[in-house]
Amino acid sequence: MSTSQPDDSNNRIVAVTLDEESIGRSGPDIEHERAIAIYDLVEKNLFAPEGAGDGPFTLHIGITGSRLMFDIRREDGAPVITHLLSLSPFRRIVKDYFMICDSYYQAIRTATPDKIEAIDMGRRGIHDEGSRTLQERLSGKVRIDFETARRLFTLISVLHWKG
């Protein structure tokens, strides 16, 4: 008896946009992180809204009030679902993430390789924590893999950060 895995080839994001009104002022380092995260996310991801059937999907991310908004649509623009998630579980993680990112960007200009590596390990650890939190918050709503969660967390951080 064989168990077949679901075909996830169409369960993916093909386009992602960020609500421009939600984006805080940011420097070139943050803009670079955002561009890389969007590119990497569209290139490879697993994104399967529960009960929506096969994709592909587009995703618009924004902040409305104190909530994170995931506006999910089909590739042709037809609405699928909008999820609103509380930002509370992300506030401390995003704050810590940007504090360590600031240290990292300063360190790569002046610090020793060992110090840069130590800061980068801390940065990755906080990023992983945010990614796991996002997976937990989306559980039962949208199935995503860890790498997709990492890229989405980067984008959430850009929205959440108010410089």
UniProtKB/Swiss-Prot annotation:
It comes from the Bacteria. This is UPF0262 protein RPD_4278. Belongs to the UPF0262 family. Signal peptide: none annotated. HAMAP family: UPF0262. Pfam families: UPF0262. It comes from Rhodopseudomonas palustris (strain BisB5).
